[in-house]
């Protein structure tokens, strides 16, 4: 009979099989009431599952991350329960957990309106408030199939036929009259599922295949308590205010249009930000001793076949043909950099050779996945490839890691999560090659005292990689930087150097990107700063304004002086009230507004206001210019007097 070992090392002995709920009751009624599931020998199980042999047990409650995930999964079932009551002929497909919530794909003979979604959410609340027990039954494959055939649930039948072995015992979860199928675990009672909200609907193909029927996907969020739900909804509200698409339109940064899906039309102010980022990156390339190159954006398909990209990546590549030759528009820069490396004989004395490019790349992303600047088809990578010997790998990866943290700190990103992605099932190269590559990356991270976690199977097909995920002011994750070893591509493209022994050797390539897509990074910065870009990055850094026509000449002289000092400045001489001008430029997020009245003209000074509404008073013009230059030169995140 089972001996149950608890997390504190204490043991409980039983003369019969027990469930996690039984053990929780044995410990105390308070814990039993809070029990959502159990972790038995490291595996999540339902609170009602029986433990027949000696085992370790942790009780899972809403305070645990796993508990919250189970609540969200059960809310998906609750959605199914409610929608089948409102529209009984609905066919249920899949309802998994996603970040911060859940969704359910449904086949419904009507397009859900906002009113329908509100009615569905209301019915979900009515059902949850009944606090009914969720009953789990393990049944045979045949019984499960018969159950869903009788209920007309063709998608569940398809899952059973195609994804579940005939000797398996699927779990059926009974929510009163509603039945769903799942591996589980799920909540034992719906009292845990009171704090949720349906968020939106979207289209989704069954099994993600555009040849299949388009279903309706209903998204929801769910939390352990009302406070957490409200906090999340407030974060979403703030995120909506910061949406880069909205701010991009307000500030006239860029636009997208149907004739060029996923391609950016940069306007003057947006392109100014883009070019300033390039200047910043170039300064770091110089500091870390990189060459800058430029390769063609289109190359013969034969080259992409040599690299392995054609076999592994062709669905994401745009192609064209001319004079009976097929060309691929590059989705990445590495093959072109190898061609540059291959020009001329290289010696071990030439290594490491660090080659960088603002590479214009194109990928055929699905139209439904496109999202402003965050997901595009045409983008520019701050890409680099380091050609080095095996002995140089560790030092070069260390330098890449330092460069990543150096650059991110400029923008104020402090929370950075690092993951090491290992070999995928679909890959090129030997296991020995992968063993060596993965070990080199892990050691480099350890030497820099950087905590990291493994992402098993998530590496690129040609090598493992380190991924740097930064978190913004709303605690949203953005995966931007990568450092990736590649022992395969150099040999595929015949790259070589002459070693100290006068023998030809194959270099190692380290693929390195820090900002990633420049377009996406500008989208991230737009939302991080809510359009209040630091002065060095702002498209217009200063606006000089007159109060009446009598100050126009002084404004023009001051504007010219600021321009000569390297400051991006505009003069506003319109015949408008000064309050109107200040409001307009404040809405445009211009960092500084310099107001010139008669007193300022007489004293040779200027009244300085910030976009945050702070009045810095009347200051000497030369002092203002000097302070602005220092703020811009240092790429400060703070404005004067902040």
Curated annotation (Swiss-Prot):
Its EC number is 6.1.1.3. Keywords: Aminoacyl-tRNA synthetase, ATP-binding, Cytoplasm, Ligase, Metal-binding, Nucleotide-binding, Protein biosynthesis, RNA-binding, tRNA-binding, Zinc. PROSITE patterns: AA_TRNA_LIGASE_II, TGS. InterPro entries: aa-tRNA-synt_IIb, aa-tRNA-synth_II, aa-tRNA-synth_II/BPL/LPL, Anticodon-bd, Anticodon-bd_dom_sf, Beta-grasp_dom_sf, TGS, TGS-like. It is found in: Cytoplasm. It comes from the Bacteria. Zn(2+) binds at residues 334, 385, 511. Binds 1 zinc ion per subunit. Its cofactor is Zn(2+). It holds the Pfam family tRNA_SAD. One of its GO terms (molecular function) is threonine-tRNA ligase activity. One of its GO terms (cellular component) is cytosol. The keyword Cytoplasm applies. The keyword Nucleotide-binding applies. Residues 1-61 form the TGS domain. Coiled coil: none annotated. It catalyses: tRNA(Thr) + L-threonine + ATP = L-threonyl-tRNA(Thr) + AMP + diphosphate + H(+). Residues 243-534 are annotated as: Catalytic. NCBIfam families: thrS (TIGR00418). Catalyzes the attachment of threonine to tRNA(Thr) in a two-step reaction: L-threonine is first activated by ATP to form Thr-AMP and then transferred to the acceptor end of tRNA(Thr). Also edits incorrectly charged L-seryl-tRNA(Thr). Homodimer. Belongs to the class-II aminoacyl-tRNA synthetase family. This is Threonine--tRNA ligase. It comes from Salmonella paratyphi A (strain AKU_12601). The gene is thrS.
């Amino acid at each position: 009979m089972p001996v149950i070992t608890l997390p504190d090392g204490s043991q409980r002995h039983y003369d019969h099989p027990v469930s996690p709920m039984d053990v929780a009751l044995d410990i105390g009624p308070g814990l039993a009431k809070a029990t959502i599931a159990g972790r038995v020998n490291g595996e999540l199980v339902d609170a009602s599952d029986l433990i027949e042999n000696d085992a370790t047990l942790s009780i899972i409650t809403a305070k645990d991350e796993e508990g919250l995930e189970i609540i969200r999964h059960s809310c998906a079932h609750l959605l199914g329960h409610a929608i089948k009551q409102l529209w009984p002929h609905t066919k249920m497909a899949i309802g998994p957990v996603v970040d911060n919530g859940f969704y359910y794909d449904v086949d419904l003979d009507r397009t859900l309106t906002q009113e329908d979604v509100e009615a569905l959410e209301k019915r979900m609340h009515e059902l949850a408030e009944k606090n009914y027990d969720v009953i789990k039954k393990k049944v045979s494959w045949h019984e499960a199939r018969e159950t869903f055939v009788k209920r007309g649930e063709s998608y569940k039948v398809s899952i059973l036929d195609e994804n579940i072995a005939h000797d398996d015992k699927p779990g059926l979860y009974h929510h009163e009259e509603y039945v769903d199928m799942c591996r589980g675990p799920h909540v034992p009672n719906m009292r845990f599922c009171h704090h949720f909200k349906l968020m939106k609907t979207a289209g989704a193909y069954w099994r993600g295949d555009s040849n299949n029927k388009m279903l309706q996907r209903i998204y929801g969020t769910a939390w352990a308590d009302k406070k957490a739900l409200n906090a999340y909804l407030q974060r979403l509200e703030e995120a909506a205010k910061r949406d880069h698409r909205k701010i991009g339109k307000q500030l006239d940064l860029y636009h997208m249009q149907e004739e060029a899906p996923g391609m950016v039309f940069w306007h003057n102010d947006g392109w100014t930000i883009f070019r300033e980022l390039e200047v910043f990156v170039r300064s770091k390339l110089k500091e870390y001793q990189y060459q800058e190159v430029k390769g063609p954006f289109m190359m013969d398909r034969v080259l992409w076949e040599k690299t392995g990209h054609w076999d592994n990546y062709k669905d994401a590549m745009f192609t064209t043909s001319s004079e009976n030759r097929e060309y691929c528009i590059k989705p990445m820069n590495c093959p072109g950099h190898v061609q540059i490396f291959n020009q001329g004989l290289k010696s071990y004395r030439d290594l490491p050779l660090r080659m960088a490019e603002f590479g214009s790349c194109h990928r055929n992303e699905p139209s439904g996945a496109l999202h402003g600047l965050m997901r595009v088809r045409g983008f520019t990578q701050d890409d680099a490839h380091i050609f080095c010997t095996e002995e140089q790998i560790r030092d070069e990866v260390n330098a890449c890691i330092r460069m990543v943290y150096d650059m991110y700190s400029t923008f104020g990103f402090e929370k950075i999560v690092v993951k090491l992605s290992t070999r995928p099932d679909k890959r090129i190269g030997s296991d020995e090659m992968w063993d060596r590559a993965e070990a080199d990356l892990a050691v480099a991270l350890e030497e820099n005292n950087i905590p990291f976690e493994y992402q098993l199977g998530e590496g690129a097909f040609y090598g493992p990689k380190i991924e740097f995920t930064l978190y913004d002011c709303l605690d949203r994750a953005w995966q931007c930087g990568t450092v990736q070893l590649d022992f395969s591509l150099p040999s595929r493209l015949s790259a070589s150097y002459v070693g100290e022994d006068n023998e030809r050797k194959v270099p190692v390539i380290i693929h390195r990107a820090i900002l990633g897509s420049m377009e996406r990074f500008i989208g991230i910065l737009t939302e991080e700063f809510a359009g209040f870009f630091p002065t060095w990055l702002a498209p217009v850094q200063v606006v000089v304004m007159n109060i009446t026509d009598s100050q126009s000449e002084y404004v023009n002289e001051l504007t010219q002086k600021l321009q000569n000092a390297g400051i991006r400045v505009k003069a506003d001489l319109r015949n408008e009230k000064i309050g109107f001008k200040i409001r307009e430029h404040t809405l445009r997020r211009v960092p500084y507004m310099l107001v010139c009245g008669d007193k300022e003209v007489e004293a040779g000074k200027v009244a300085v206001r910030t976009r945050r509404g702070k009045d810095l008073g009347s200051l000497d013009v030369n002092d203002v210019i000097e302070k602005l230059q220092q703020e811009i030169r240092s790429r400060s995140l703070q404005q004067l007097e902040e």
